[in-house]
Amino acid sequence: MKKFVCLANLMLLVVFSTTSSLAVAQDEVEVETVVEGLNNPSGIAIQPETGVVFIADSGALRVVRVIDGKAEPVIVGFTRDNYGKGPIYDIGPLGLLFLDKDTLVVGGGGKPDGEEMIRVYKVPDPGAEPIKAENTEGEPKMLPATDAMVGEGNFYGLAKGAKGIYVTCNGDDQKGWVSLATLSGLKIDKFERKIATKMVTLVDAPVAITISPEGHVTVGQMGEISVAGDSLLTFYNEDGKMLDNFRTGLNDITGLAYGPKHGRLFATDFNWLDTDNGGLYKIIAIKDNYEECKAQEIVKLKKPTALAFDSDGNLYITLAGNTSEGAETPDGKLVMIKGLDFVPED
C-alpha cells in the first residue's frame, strides 16, 4: 500500500492541475471558429516550424490544412467506413501526428478491422496538388487477425514516445489494445499490439492518448458510449506497465493534451448520451484521493473529437457536426481558444 500511495501522490503532483490555482470561469472563455464545413473531423496535428493546423476531415475522406481560414486538401482518396450506435458517423482518416515538418503519420478508420492501416506521408507544399492516400512513404502497416486475436482498426489516437508511436485501437473489445509502431528513421518499421488496456482497467475503448511531460503514456479510456461517467484516465510506462488509473466522471473522452506552458492536462468529452452537453475539461487532482480525479468544465462544446495545443498555448478543437443527424451539408468545425495555457510575463 505504501508503494501505491507514493506513486499516486507522484502522479497527482506532476500530472494534474490543482484546484486552487487553476480555476477558469466559463464566461472568460471565448471559443473562436477557425474553419467551418468539415465532415466529422476527427484528428488534429500542428505542423512543426510553421504552426499550420492539419485536420483529419474524416467523413470527407481527406486530410486538410488550414490556410487563410480555409481548408486546403493535402491527402485525398481515403476509404470510408462508419462508427457509432444511434447516430452513425462516416469515418476515413483519424489520428494525425507529425514526425517532422514534412512527415505526417495518419491512423486509418476507413477499412474493416484487420485491414486498417497506419501510414506515413510526405506532405506537399502549400498550394500544391493534394496527394493520393495510397502514395505513402514506406509500406503501410496493419494488425491483421491471428489464430488468437481479432484484427484491429480505428486508429484514433497517435502519440510519439521514446520507443515509437503509441496508437489507440478499437478492434478487440476484450483487450482494448494500445499498439506500438516502432520507427526506422521516418518510416514505420514494426507495428504490434503493446498494452491490453481492458485487461488492467476493466473498461474498453482506449481512444485518447498523449505523452505526459514525464514520458508516461497517458490514455483516455472512453468506455461504453451507452454508459454515463465510465471514462478513465490511465498512465503506463513505455514498457506497458500500468502506473496508475483514475476515474474521471466523464462520459466519453475523445482527446487529451498537455499545455506547452504550464503542463496542465485537458480532455474533450463527446458525451454520446447527451451531445449538447459535451465539453472541454481540465483534469484536477483531488487531494488524498488515489482513485479519482476531478474534471473541471472549461466550456461546453457539442461533439468535440480531438484537441491540440500550438506552441503559444492556443488550443484547437475539432467538432464533429450534425451530418449523422440529417444536416444537409457538413457542418463540422475547427475552433480555437486563445491563450488557454498562456503564461503571462512578469
Language-model-detected regions and their locations in the chain:
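Beta-rich, blade/repeat-based domains predominating
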Residues: E36-T50, R80-G107, P140-Y166, K198-E224, ...
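A short helix->beta-strand "capping" segment at the edge of beta-propeller domains
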Residues: A25-L38
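Structural motif
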Residues: D113-R119, Q174-A181, V227-L233, T275-Y281, ...
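Blade-level signature of beta-propeller repeat domains, shared across WD40, Kelch, NHL, RCC1
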Residues: A306-D346
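C-terminal segment of classical bacterial N-terminal signal peptides
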Residues: V14-V24
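Beta-propeller fold detector
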Residues: E32-V35, G69-T79, A128-A145, D189-T201, ...
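Short loop/turn segments that connect beta-strands within beta-propeller blades
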Residues: V66-K70, K122-G127, L183-K187, Y236-K241, ...
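Short loop/turn segments immediately following the C-termini of beta-strands
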Residues: S58-G59, G109-K111, N170-D173, E214, ...
